[in-house]
Curated annotation (Swiss-Prot):
It comes from Rhizobium rhizogenes (strain K84 / ATCC BAA-868). The gene is rlmN. The keyword Nucleotide-binding does not apply. S-adenosyl-L-methionine binds at residues 208-209, 240, 262-264, 339. Its cofactor is [4Fe-4S] cluster. GO terms for cellular component: cytoplasm. This is Dual-specificity RNA methyltransferase RlmN.
Amino acid sequence: MSAIDVMTPSKLKPMPVSQPVELSPKPSLIGLTREEMGAALKEKGVADKQVKMRVSQLWNWIYVRGVSDFDAMANVSKDMREMLKAHFTIARPEIVEEQVSNDGTRKWLLRFPPRGAGRPVEVETVYIPEEGRGTLCVSSQVGCSLTCSFCHTGTQRLVRNLTAEEILSQLLLARDRLGDFPDREAPQGTIMPAEGRKVSNMVMMGMGEPLYNFESVKTALLIASDGDGLSLSKRRITLSTSGVVPEIYRTGDEIGVMLAISLHAVRDDLRDMLVPINKKYPLKELMDACRAYPGLSNARRITFEYVMLKGVNDSLEDAKGLIQLLKGIPSKINLIPFNPWPGTNYQCSDWEQIEKFADFINAAGYASPIRTPRGRDILAACGQLKSDSERMRKTERLAFEAMMIANHGED
């Protein structure tokens, strides 16, 4: 039996989803730590002796059962449910658009309600079904400040960070839509693993730089990996960064998930152009942080992502430099055929050259899979994500970026 189960007929039927709470001032319980959830309940009058029990109940209903309506919590008293409805929400974001690629990749454009005096924002989340696993690509920011020259998201101005709730809500909504919670069914025609979890892996590789939103990402990933809730193994969660060196150290110490580096060049002069954060954290500093990442072994390697750009970084000299750069680091090198997007000046390397590059690296003892492009037809592939939320004024954006730089010790 194939590890991929294709449901028929193939015509997509949107399944009912919970309606978002529009302009709701009520805080969400999603994304709160147990301690924060307990404090929120106490503030609304829950007796001290009941708080721990109530938190356990809510945790199970939200993250194990996947409910988005307090009335579905069958073992919670009616009075308690009424209090929860009056003061809190566990609603999902609004699905603005759902697209399904010919290869089964699924992309959601999600809208989150305003924060404070802000406006609603939109982000993209992508589900990639493969044999034996299903990977969810999650966004951490609305837009991005890093302006990597080959990345479509980099052309979208940074609007704001996502909260821990908004990061986790992408995972909860995907599991809703894919029938990955009890008593849920996926739309007919959905391609997904035939056995086990529909969302087995989570990668912080969507819109934004996760390590410029460290605290929210940390909270979300620790909740996602909590053994009494969503229970994703930390070895099945990968955080991808362009190289925010100070926070790479913190990621290893405080989160402990798998690490991926958006590398793309082996010389500082070229990487300065492709990945401008390299001007602040050059390759030597980045490699030092990688070598210090806790728990590295042949079974726990850092993934280095390398987009193949024709005539830019795809020579055998580049391959030789890559081998030298990664010496002593347990590594896997993902070679990514460049995914075109409207307005780009880059081209994908010829397939023959990509294979030569991969063979050269493989001969040196490094795993060097060529990533199969997924979801290109719906702009869901690596480097293609972008939403229409570009509403932060220039002065606000520059102030926000200056704050982030100050918080990371930049000049």
